[in-house]
UniProtKB/Swiss-Prot annotation:
Keywords: Electron transport, Heme, Iron, Membrane, Metal-binding, Mitochondrion, Mitochondrion inner membrane, Respiratory chain, Transmembrane, Transmembrane helix, Transport, Ubiquinone
Localization terms from the record: Mitochondrion inner membrane
InterPro entries for this protein: Cyt_b/b6_C, Cyt_b/b6_C_sf, Cyt_b/b6_N, Cytb/b6-like_sf, Cytochrome_b, Cytochrome_b_C_euk/bac, Cytochrome_b_N_euk/bac, Di-haem_cyt_TM
Protein name: Cytochrome b
Xref: Gene3D superfamilies: Cytochrome Bc1 Complex, Chain C
GO cellular component: mitochondrial inner membrane; respiratory chain complex III
UniProt family annotation: Belongs to the cytochrome b family.
UniProt function note: Component of the ubiquinol-cytochrome c reductase complex (complex III or cytochrome b-c1 complex) that is part of the mitochondrial respiratory chain. The b-c1 complex mediates electron transfer from ubiquinol to cytochrome c. Contributes to the generation of a proton gradient across the mitochondrial membrane that is then used for ATP synthesis.
Top-level lineage group: Eukaryota
Pfam families hit by this protein: Cytochrom_B_C, Cytochrome_B
Coiled coil region boundaries: none
Amino acid sequence: MTIIRKSHPLFKIINHAFIDLPTPPNISGLWNFGSLLGMCLVLQIFTGLFLAMHYTSDTLTAFSSVTHICRDVNYGWLIRYMHANGASLFFICLYIHIGRGIYYGSYLYKETWNIGILLLFLTMATAFVGYVLPWGQMSFWGATVITNLLSAIPYVGQDLVEWIWGGFSVDKATLTRFFAFHFILPFIIAALAMVHLLFLHETGSNNPLGIMSDYDKIPFHPYYTIKDLLGVILLLLLFLTLALFFPDKLGDPDNYMPANPLNTPPHIKPEWYFLFAYAILRSIPNKLGGVIALALSILILAFLPYLHTSNQRSMMFRPLSQVLYWTLVTDLLLLTWIGGQPVEPPFIIIGQLASILYFSIILILMPTAGLIENKMLKW
């Protein structure tokens, strides 16, 4: 008799995706972040659901409803801080996941990679609209500044901004629709994550060597389920330490002040996970140019499969590419720091140089390094 997990129409799908899935035997801990992202998404959906039960999306009561959650709801403070810090955790995992994909050449699975980029955009959109909901000072001004960037689009820009706002400024209509978007988007992300997995399982997982491993596979369960479980435990340890001991470490103190359209905060800046893109935006003195650079800073990921010039897939045995890769990582950390600084010397020039370096490494230096390494292998 066939085991039920192999014959049942529903269990069969789960079996092929998580139990009997043929997996390369040499994938490292960096491959854990896919499952950790899944865990983060589930965590965010559940904590978000409980927060939505007590939250009111009205400009007059939004701020006080968040206060009410923290003070009066049973474990409301914990749910709120888990949700807020869960977003940071989500982006940490997301950036490491993308970084691993770049290092080991996973972007050559084009369908999986492109859906991943779409998932990144949707996650960023979800985080942005979610940050507006507490209706603090930084929520209000962040929403005003970022949505206003769309007015740089020729002809339709201003109409587009007013259409998103639902009026002539960020107000009740904006908050209500942002709450609606923030509620629905995670479910769209979950559906797309399934498609992401579907395409990944068509080709099979990549591995650190970047070579085909079809002749040498092991089942996902029990080997990688145990490995993923270890990752989950370690991540939860880090997460709960952050949420319970340092709940406001990654937040902005300005957001503890109710939104006031008549009083601008001294430094308007987004959450830490958007600072690198914000620094690129600010490094160009032209509004439209800045918006284009901002969009390209993420969209550039879609060009990676076409900029791959090396004969080897992975960077594991490519020393020049490795140096450039870690320079890129350092550059992104530098941009993140600059994004949180005021617009004044020497931060302006550092931001501009870091932005130029970011695009130069990806568009020019990495493809050139690939060609040089090909030549070196022939000598």
